[in-house]
From Swiss-Prot:
Its EC number is 6.3.5.2. It catalyses: XMP + L-glutamine + ATP + H2O = GMP + L-glutamate + AMP + diphosphate + 2 H(+). This is GMP synthase [glutamine-hydrolyzing]. Keywords: ATP-binding, Glutamine amidotransferase, GMP biosynthesis, Ligase, Nucleotide-binding, Purine biosynthesis. Homodimer. GO terms for cellular component: cytosol. InterPro entries: Class_I_gatase-like, GATASE, GMP_synth_C, GMP_synth_GATase, GMP_synthase, GMPS_ATP_PPase_dom, NAD/GMP_synthase, Rossmann-like_a/b/a_fold. It comes from the Bacteria. HAMAP family: GMP_synthase. Residues 12-205 form the Glutamine amidotransferase type-1 domain. Residues 206-395 form the GMPS ATP-PPase domain. It is an enzyme of class 6 (ligase). GO terms for molecular function: ATP binding; GMP synthase activity.
């Protein structure tokens, strides 16, 4: 069987994007059940879906009202394909509105719901098989279904939602007003699994090995016999992309490792030894530290920093590519979380991402982003499946802009050194305590704040370093890590004693949301 025919044989469930910031969680949950799933635009037509030939379709949640003049719609022929369709929140309202039911502002009907609610099942349904008749679900809707379309029947309700679940088994259409993809819906995973396996007929045989086969085939088809340039940042994402690309196209890949002066301690040498030595990647190391730091001098705004770094990265690549022949593609380690935070057609921008929002319009390369449907933990699983060792796969995430976004305000050599040295101490102590796998991400930040201190018999007026340590599954949400006090004490004592120009340590105890993982 050829790679392309093997790809066509992989079962797929398509999630249509209607604007929820957590849409990819639906696809992610379905992939956990061994069924491949990915997002597509809500503009997709019935014919395009026929060509994809999915075993199921999910209509996601979203912030709009289905009755608004600018509401995101759907090709009505999609409902005639005979493919099982699950509408979630806005998706259920869209099914209702399109097929002749009634949706009204919940304030008018008194059915507005935000937060956990108790769902009561009123009739048996394959969608809810194996779940209790009463269960906690997460509701988040400002509109409500007050009349379901002809051919549908009520499956479940709640105190404030008369139609919390409905179905038309003849047409294989299902609607739920709550969000099964989030953890607050206690049996949400069971519901999505029932849809993917029992209703859609998923075999549950998709794995990261399948993803590797799919991406290799896609890369080879896209690239042909042309050449690809990859920017290595020293982080997990670009390292995994490098190994994947080498597996796909071999010596057609050239890696550019830009030392922009914003790397962690000893990072440059480690990258060369790890990826060039162990994995045999062809890496050109470029010392562009003065070039970057000169451009960043006096810049305080975090968005401007990101744009400058993103632009300059590409210009450096352009300079290096001009020395090579026939380079047409630029590969990046963009993850789905980066795309979400940078905003999409249906989702608002939280902050621009260096792999998404910092690229100049006159860029001379086509982009290849093999990881842009994956979350961080899936990237680690991909690295393991590619045979990469734990010290690479479990390396701490590191943003493309590097320490520039871990120095608040203007970047100076002195500030950079405080972060570089304090971060090294933090990583050493976390490793000594055996907490590397328990803490999802950890790093230090120069807050830009100076405070008065006493060292020896003298007064000091030096920087405050913040420690950021979080626990998370996929980076979409996170909690601050509850590090043992004795570990925090060791870290604090070492930093103030070993790092010049630092006299105070604080611990960031903010979750995401409301904060993001990085400070800038």
């Amino acid at each position: 069987m050829t790679e392309i025919s093997m790809l066509n044989d992989i079962q797929k469930i398509i999630v249509l994007d209607y604007g929820s910031q957590y849409n990819q969680l639906i696809a992610r949950r379905i992939r956990e059940f061994g069924v491949f799933s990915e997002l597509k635009s809500h503009h997709i037509t019935a014919q395009e879906l026929r060509d994809i030939n999915p075993i199921g379709i999910v209509l996601s949640g979203g912030p709009n009202s289905v009755y608004a003049t600018d509401a995101f719609g759907i090709d009505p022929e999609i409902f005639e394909l005979g493919i099982p369709i699950l509408g979630i929140c806005y998706g259920m309202q869209l099914i209702t509105h399109t097929l002749g039911g009634k949706v009204v502002p919940a304030g008018q009907a008194g059915h507005r719901e935000y937060g956990q609610s108790s769902l009561r099942l009123r009739s048996a349904s394959a969608l809810f098989a194996g779940t209790p008749d009463e269960q906690l679900v997460l509701m988040s809707h400002g509109d409500a279904v007050t009349e379901i379309p002809e051919g549908f029947h009520l499956v479940g309700d709640s105190n404030d939602c008369p139609y919390a679940a409905m179905e038309n088994t003849k047409k294989r259409l299902y609607g739920i007003q709550f969000h099964p993809e989030v953890r607050h819906s206690v049996y949400g995973n069971d519901i999505l699994k029932n849809f993917a396996i029992s209703i859609c007929g998923g075999r549950g045989d998709w794995s990261m090995d399948n993803f590797i086969d799919m991406q290799i085939a896609k890369i080879r088809e896209t690239v042909g016999d042309r050449k690809v340039l990859l920017g290595l940042s020293g982080g997990v994402d670009s390292s995994v992309v490098g190994v994947l690309l080498q597996k796909a196209i071999g010596d057609q890949l050239t890696c550019i490792f830009v030392d922009h002066g914003l790397l962690r301690k000893n990072e440059g040498d480690q990258v060369m030894e790890m990826l060039g030595g162990r994995f045999g990647l062809n890496i050109i190391r470029v010392d562009a530290s003065k070039r970057f730091l000169d451009l960043l001098a006096g810049v305080e705004d975090p968005e401007k920093k990101r744009k400058i770094i993103g632009n300059e990265f590409v210009y450096v690549f352009d300079d290096e590519a001009s020395k090579l022949k026939g380079v047409d593609f630029l590969a990046q380690g963009t993850l789905y979380t980066d795309i979400i935070e940078s905003g999409t057609e249906t989702a608002q921008t939280i902050k621009s991402h260096h792999n998404v929002g910092g690229l100049p319009e006159d860029m001379q390369f086509e982009l290849i982003e093999p990881l842009n449907t994956l979350f961080k933990d899936e990237v680690r699983a991909l690295g393991t499946a590619l045979g990469m060792p734990d010290e690479v796969v479990w390396r701490q995430p590191f943003p493309g802009p590097g320490l520039a976004i871990r120095v608040m305000g203007e970047i100076t050599a002195e500030k950079l050194e405080t972060v570089r040295e304090s971060d090294a101490i933090l990583r050493e102590e976390i490793a000594k305590a055996g907490l590397e796998r328990d803490v999802w991400q950890y790093f230090t930040v120069n807050t830009g704040v100076r405070s008065v201190g006493v060292m020896g018999d003298g007064r000091t007026y030096d920087y405050t370093i913040a420690i950021r340590a979080i626990t998370s599954i996929d980076g979409m949400t996170a909690d601050f890590a509850q590090l043992p006090w004795e570990v925090l004490k060791k870290i604090s004592v070492r930093i103030v004693n070993e790092v010049d120009h630092v006299n105070r340590i604080v611990y960031d105890i903010t979750s995401k949301p409301p904060a993001t993982v990085e400070w800038e």
